[in-house]
Structure formats: structure tokens, C-alpha cells
């Protein structure tokens, strides 16, 4: 009996197949600091530090930034050519995106007519209204659309149209193909130079006119600005410059900014004088003598305004005002206004150097006359036969208890303007007369002419002082007159 032997091969059932471990990539061999990036295949450095290996097939990226002019530090594969350009992976990606976007822009979208033709196939007519001819034409139209080839002419876009100069004299495109020297003339070198010179002179005059126009616009706008500022100042007053008291923080900041703007680029002192000289020299060099005269006249005009009209008088040297309006300059100290009188005030400027309180010629006070000529008084006959009461006695000349001697200098006789011969009151008895003469004056009448001759030379220089001292013994009741009535006196 034949036996069949079956050989059973051992199976791996129940055994765990070991998973092959993948070798971990080695890290970068950068020596300056540890780098955890994996090495490139066949290299010892990563893509970031591969340039440390001079034999590696890599070089620095050729991209240069347009902002700062620096070159990209990343590594890029070496090109086949020695002087070839190669970029890193990042800049290659950016170039691809930029190229793709540019292709999208250059490729025009579907034209409106093409879209209408494509959609017109869906516009079917109503059922029952189709005829064999219309159905035949519809079929032929569909076949025509299907046979549309890309090689046919595309519709013209706006960018592809001819751009001509609308102000040119050309009437058609064919004019560009004509001879440009068709209407040209034949000139010599001297004639060409003269023509070019005339053109340059004309161009220069046009530029000068344009510059003058700009200057006129600047002056006009400045005038409007000053007028508006004056109106605003009259309407609002000087409330902005009263001080930071009672203002909010924002208002204080605005006030500070306004003050800074007012003195922004404003020149002072020597700098202002030099700047003015520079402007005058520039205007003299550009515009000539006529402009110099105009500049001199305009710069020497007074800055004062009378009834909104500028004063046309010439200003004083080193000032901006004339002699009439010089007192409007608060910084000057050489002139003062005339005070005038109480009835008619006067504001005419007068130099301070003339006197401490200057006055104009109309209100000038004359000094007292230094020389007084001698006057021979004629005594009328009626005065010689006058009564004895006209003269005072020595007892009346003495100071009384009611009026002390210290107040005698302040007496002033009212009514001293009447014409009469000098009285013995004009002389001091204690100074000019002896004691016996005083007694004679008390008993007998005074010889007026004799006393005048005797005390003329000695008492004329002391007339004012003696008159004040002689009026001291007057009593409070007054001076006795010829009628026996007391004459009133006053204390000044």
C-alpha cells in the first residue's frame, strides 16, 4: 500500500516580524553653534549652512533686493554656466507666482460678443413657430461655431489700438510715413543760430512772465490772508493770547502751537539785516535798474495805514515809518508826541533831544526874556496930589500875629496889572532902607521918584525876590486903596 508523505512547511504564524528601523538622518556639522537641521544627501551641512563647504555644488542666491540693495544669503544650486544666474527655492517660487500673475494680466478675458454668441444657442424660439428654414439655419450656425479655430483673428482690445497725439497736425496714420523734412527750409549756420536765439529769448520772456504771475498770485493770497486775519482779530479780539489761565489742556496745546507758528522761520537781528541785503542784491541782479528803483521805493515807503490806505511818505532811515507815523513804532526812543494844550491836544512827533518835554513849534513855550531895557515912568499930576491913604505905614508893614512871617512869601496881590508907580511894598525896608528912613516913611509921604533913582541899580536885579518879601507884612484884610476900601489878597 502506497503511503503519501506530506511535508508541511513551517509558517510564521504567531511570530512577530521585526520592523526595520529607518536610519535617522545625521544633523548638520556646523561648528559655530549646534544645528538640528538634517544634512543634505551626500553633504555634511544642511541647506542653510551648505555654503560653508567650498566644494559643494551650491552658491549664494543671485537675487538682490531693490529696497536696500542687499543680496539674498540663502544657498542656490550652481548653474551649468559659470556666470549663470541661480536663485534659492524661495525666490524661485516667488518668480513663478509673479510670472503666473503676469500671464493672467496679459491674457484678456472673454469678450462680450463671444459670450453672447455662446449664450445665444440657449435662446430657443417658441414651440410650433420653428420652420424648416430656421431649423436649418440654426444647425448651420452651430456648425459654424464648432468650426471656430483659434488661428483666426481675435478682437482688438483697447491696448492694441493706435495711440496718436490728439493735438498734432496729423490727420491720419499715413502722415507718419511721410518725409519729415517735407516742409523744412534751407538755412545757413548763422540763420539757424539766430532762429534758435530768438526762440530762447522768447522762451525766457515766457518764463519771466510766468514767474511774475506766480509772484502776483502769492501777493494776492497774502493780502487776502492778512485781511482775513484782521477781520478775525477784530471779531474775536486777542482772547487767544491772554494767557493759559482758565484754558483746557487741548486749548493750551493749540495756543502753544499757534505761537510757534507765528515765529516759525522768522529772522531777528543781524540775520534779518543780512537776509534783506541778500534779497535786494538778488532782485538787482535779476531785474536791473528799473526793478531796483521800484524796490527802493517800495521798501522805503511807510507801513502805516490811514483809512485803510497805505501811507505814501518815505520812511526814516533804519525804520519802517515816516516822520508823521514814527510814534506808531513802539521800539523807537528818539521821538515823542507833543502834548499840546488842554483845549487842543497835539500828537505831532518831536525829537527827544531838544528837551525833556518836547513840543512842536506851535505849542513851544518861549523862555523868559533875559534882558529888560530900562523904562522911565512918568508920574501923572493926579498921583502927586493923591491922598495919604495910598501908602502904608511902617506899623502896617510889620508882620502881625494873625499872619505869621513864614507865610509872607506865599502872598500874591490880586489886581497887580493896573498901571501905577512902584510902591514901597516892592522893596524890603530891612534891606534897602535905614532905620531912620523907615521912621520917615511912617510919618511923611514917600518920595517915589527919589527912591526909584536911589534903588534903581541895586534893586532891579532883585525885583522878583524883593516883591515877594515886601508883600509879607500885608494883613489879612487886604491893601488899602485911595477910596479907603480894602483890596482883596490871595494865597497862591
Swiss-Prot record:
Its main location: nucleus. The keyword Nucleus applies. It is found in: Nucleus; Mitochondrion. GO terms for cellular component: actin cytoskeleton; cytosol; histone acetyltransferase complex; mitochondrion; NSL complex; nucleoplasm; plasma membrane. Coiled coil: none annotated. The keyword Magnesium does not apply. There is a cross-link at residue 78 (Glycyl lysine isopeptide (Lys-Gly) (interchain with G-Cter in SUMO2)). Keywords: Chromatin regulator, Isopeptide bond, Mitochondrion, Nucleus, Phosphoprotein, Ubl conjugation. Residues 135-144 have a biased composition (Basic and acidic residues). Residues 167-178 have a biased composition (Acidic residues). Non-catalytic component of the NSL histone acetyltransferase complex, a multiprotein complex that mediates histone H4 acetylation at 'Lys-5'- and 'Lys-8' (H4K5ac and H4K8ac) at transcription start sites and promotes transcription initiation. Required for NSL complex stability and for transcription of intraciliary transport genes in both ciliated and non-ciliated cells by regulating histone H4 acetylation at 'Lys-5'- and 'Lys-12' (H4K5ac and H4K12ac). This is necessary for cilium assembly in ciliated cells and for organization of the microtubule cytoskeleton in non-ciliated cells. PANTHER family: KAT8 REGULATORY NSL COMPLEX SUBUNIT 2. Component of the NSL complex at least composed of KAT8/MOF, KANSL1, KANSL2, KANSL3, MCRS1, PHF20, OGT1/OGT, WDR5 and HCFC1. This is KAT8 regulatory NSL complex subunit 2. It comes from Homo sapiens.
